[in-house]
């Protein structure tokens, strides 16, 4: 959520009881700078201190019980500075022995006939509880927290502040702030939502699980509604300035180019080309996402579009996330276009006189198509008349980077490409009203990759399988999650150790190493050797995840595969299976969690990237699917795009109705409109 000005406070943080200069420093580390921030600093979870019936309590379970003290507490000391306090409670006519280790100070706080609440582990056989916390009723004189805290909020904190302190300070702030409603009475009544006052007070100090659910539902809807208001308003602004030059491409020339391709387009590719061409002919700027599974042929579709721009007298640009991918795209496009187009490559490695000449040719129109990394968005990169901007693996760039590239031309058409199929849930959130073309069909002759799962102890067997492929003249990838060994992850294989091991097995000259710490020149040299079949086995981190294309590679081993998400595993797997030869992917993993086992099982069951993306989103959540910063998604405090998908659709419909009807711009919504405009509209989530 944004910095809040719909919550007004009569004082600053320093004026709150218990907050001094040192506490301010700690709060600032938690991104709490104002009383408003404090009020919106929501708990990460809740401790359930609800008192239960002992007759229903399971043995060795954590329980909360309430009873009357009927023996005075006794403390016994043992060892060095260790103690054991024993006291007996009567709990609904059941005599319970309570034991507290290393809390001797409780002896002065617990009195005969006093009613107390104890939280701890229950031993049904011995009828005793090993307590870790004790609460006193609200009428008592003790300083500990009250027993009426059934659902206790737990906050993310840092050294220098305690849970009780932040709870007390939030309670104090809530008593004094003025909270303006973010939703209209009409919306709240329509969807049976609570007031923001009730919602915030309940999220911080819930009186019941039912209240907490109602508060969570209201706040989640509010977050989604404000986000969708921003998206709908931005869409309105973009469409109002979306005038574009109609690209009058040479249809006969384009058809001739397609006929000269060394392969036949799939029906899905043809459909995508037609959809894009219709956009190019339209008087408004194209804003389209081209998504396709790994190896589905998105680059060819992009190439046809670039060629069409050339026939109409316009330049095109393609921005990709890595230098390796940029070089590979440039190489493949040069081969496709031949002498018909002047293709240039601009990355961070292009410097000095070479860069100067390239920029001059770009500005005078000599270059038809520019391929590059984020170097394309630098201020001195000036196009002559760019008509199409393509961003490959667009979620790896921030919102601002994509916008800067788009602004290289006054009326530029925009095409986003991704080999990570976007789940529908994220598509409507991140991409709003963007048109989507999908390529779900693989080129003719491609065989599905056979994926198997092996445990670590089966490594030698997998090695024999890989050796068998190498003897056929094929090549192989071996993927590891780490570059170097880690003391925190001792059981995880690292790429350097595995590289050295495979060198001993196959010979030094046959094995190459690729990872993110190598320089661009070193990476290029290794990839060139692998592409030219000067090395048989490439040991790598996930730096090869996207776009690398070596058709002769037919075997992939992914070590410690359970440390990757489904989408990453699928992208890695897509480096093989790029020819008419049968390819194999072996996942080596001994997962210790149910989630890890589930991921391995799913990978062996399907090669459909669209299905995998949905499953990955369900398992990991939207924040981890792309990474919040890369995706353009805000970091919602309560809302969850998977669990609250239906709510997201409702919020989107309501926001769209308000914006499109113009009602949002009337006086009734002045307060909310100013809030969205000042806090959200021009805010980037990069």
Curated annotation (Swiss-Prot):
One of its GO terms (molecular function) is DNA helicase activity. SMART domains: DEXDc, HELICc. One of its GO terms (biological process) is DNA recombination. Keywords: ATP-binding, DNA damage, DNA recombination, DNA repair, DNA-binding, Helicase, Hydrolase, Isomerase, Nucleotide-binding. A motif (DEAH box) lies at residues 392-395. It catalyses: Couples ATP hydrolysis with the unwinding of duplex DNA by translocating in the 3'-5' direction; ATP + H2O = ADP + phosphate + H(+). The keyword NADP does not apply. ATP binds at residues 292-299. It comes from the Bacteria. Its EC number is 5.6.2.4. Residues 279-439 form the Helicase ATP-binding domain. Residues 50-149 are annotated as: Wedge domain. Pfam families: DEAD, Helicase_C, RecG_dom3_C, RecG_wedge. PROSITE patterns: HELICASE_ATP_BIND_1, HELICASE_CTER. The keyword DNA damage applies. Residues 462-618 form the Helicase C-terminal domain. The wedge domain within the N-terminus inserts into the replication fork junction, where the lagging and leading strand split. Monomer. This is ATP-dependent DNA helicase RecG. It comes from Staphylococcus aureus (strain MSSA476). The gene is recG.
């Amino acid at each position: 959520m944004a910095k809040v000005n719909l919550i007004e406070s009569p004082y600053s943080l320093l004026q709150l009881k218990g907050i001094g200069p040192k506490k301010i420093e700690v709060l600032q580390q938690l991104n709490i700078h104002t009383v408003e921030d404090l009020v919106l600093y929501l708990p990460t979870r809740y401790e359930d201190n609800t008192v239960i019936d002992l007759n229903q309590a399971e043995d060795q379970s954590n329980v909360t019980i309430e009873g009357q003290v009927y023996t005075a507490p006794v403390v016994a000391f043992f060892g060095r500075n260790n103690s054991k306090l024993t006291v007996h409670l009567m709990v609904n006519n059941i005599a319970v022995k309570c034991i507290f280790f290393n809390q001797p100070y409780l002896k002065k706080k617990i009195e005969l006939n006093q009613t107390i609440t104890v939280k701890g582990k229950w031993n049904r056989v011995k009828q005793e509880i090993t307590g870790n916390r004790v609460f006193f009723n609200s009428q008592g004189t003790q300083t500990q927290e009250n027993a009426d805290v059934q659902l206790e909020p737990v906050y993310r904190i840092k050294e220098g502040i305690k849970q009780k302190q932040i709870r007390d300070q939030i309670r104090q702030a809530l008593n004094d702030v003025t909270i303006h409603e973010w939703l209209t009475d009409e919306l709240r009544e329509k969807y049976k939502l609570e007031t923001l006052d009730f919602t915030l007070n309940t999220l911080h100090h819930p009186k019941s699980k039912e209240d907490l659910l109602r508060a969570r539902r209201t706040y989640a809807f509010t977050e989604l509604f404000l986000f969708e208001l921003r998206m709908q308003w931005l869409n309105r602004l973009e469409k109002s300035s979306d005038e574009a030059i109609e690209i009058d491409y040479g249809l006969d020339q384009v058809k001739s180019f397609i006929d000269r391709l060394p392969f036949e387009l799939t029906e899905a590719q043809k459909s995508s080309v037609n959809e894009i061409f219709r956009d190019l002919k339209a008087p408004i700027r194209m804003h389209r996402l081209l998504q396709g599974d790994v190896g589905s042929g998105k680059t060819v579709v992009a190439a046809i579009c670039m060629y069409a721009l050339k026939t109409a007298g316009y330049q095109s640009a393609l921005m990709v996330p890595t230098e390796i991918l940029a070089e590979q795209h440039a190489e493949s496009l040069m081969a496709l276009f031949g002498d018909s187009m002047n293709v240039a490559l601009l990355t961070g490695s292009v410097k000095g006189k070479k860069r100067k000449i390239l920029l001059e040719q770009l500005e005078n129109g000599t270059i038809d198509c520019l391929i590059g990394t984020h170097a394309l968005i630098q201020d001195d990169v000036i196009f002559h008349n760019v008509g199409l901007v393509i961003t490959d693996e667009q979620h790896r760039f921030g919102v601002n980077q994509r916008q800067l590239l788009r602004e290289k031309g006054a009326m530029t058409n925009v095409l986003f490409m991704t080999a990570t199929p976007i789940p529908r849930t994220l598509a409507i959130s991140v991409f709003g009203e963007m048109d989507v073309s999908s390529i779900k069909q693989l080129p003719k002759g491609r065989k599905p990759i056979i994926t198997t799962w092996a445990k670590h102890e089966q490594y030698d067997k997998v090695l024999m399988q890989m050796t068998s492929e190498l003897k056929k003249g094929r090549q192989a990838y071996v993927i590891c999650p780490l570059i170097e060994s880690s003391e925190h992850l001792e059981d995880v294989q690292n790429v350097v150790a595995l590289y050295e091991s495979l060198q001993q097995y196959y010979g030094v000259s046959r094995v190459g190493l690729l990872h993110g710490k190598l320089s661009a020149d070193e990476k290029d040299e290794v990839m060139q050797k692998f592409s030219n079949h000067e090395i048989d086995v490439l040991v790598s981190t996930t730096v090869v995840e996207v776009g690398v294309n070596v058709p002769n590679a037919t075997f992939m081993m992914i070590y410690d595969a359970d440390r990757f998400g489904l989408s990453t595993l699928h992208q890695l797997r897509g480096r093989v299976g790029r020819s008419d030869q049968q390819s194999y992917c072996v996942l080596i993993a001994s997962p210790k969690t149910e989630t890890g086992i589930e991921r391995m099982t799913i990978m062996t069951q399907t090669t459909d990237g669209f299905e995998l993306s949905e499953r990955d989103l369900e398992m990991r959540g939207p924040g981890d699917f792309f990474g919040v910063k890369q995706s353009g998604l805000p970091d919602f405090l309560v809302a969850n795009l998977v669990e609250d998908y239906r709510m997201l659709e409702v919020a989107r419909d309501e926001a769209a109705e308000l914006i499109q009807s113009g009602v949002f711009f009337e006086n009734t919504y002045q307060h909310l409109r100013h809030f969205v405009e000042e806090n959200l509209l021009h805010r980037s989530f990069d």
